[in-house]
Amino acid sequence: GDLPICGETCFGGTCNTPGCVCAWPVCNR
């Protein structure tokens, strides 16, 4: 399966996408 794409903006330090971490201001792996 394809891994979810990280890249949403994160404000509270958490990301909605599984496996992604907040590297302000965006989520990434």
UniProtKB/Swiss-Prot annotation:
The keyword Disulfide bond applies. This is Cyclotide psyleio B. One of its GO terms (biological process) is defense response. It comes from the Eukaryota. Belongs to the cyclotide family. Moebius subfamily. This is a cyclic peptide. The presence of a 'disulfide through disulfide knot' structurally defines this protein as a knottin. The lineage of its organism: Eukaryota, Viridiplantae, Streptophyta, Embryophyta, Tracheophyta. Keywords: Disulfide bond, Knottin, Plant defense. There is a cross-link at G1-R29 (Cyclopeptide (Gly-Arg)). Probably participates in a plant defense mechanism. It comes from Psychotria brachyceras. Disulfide bonds join C6-C20, C10-C22, C15-C27.
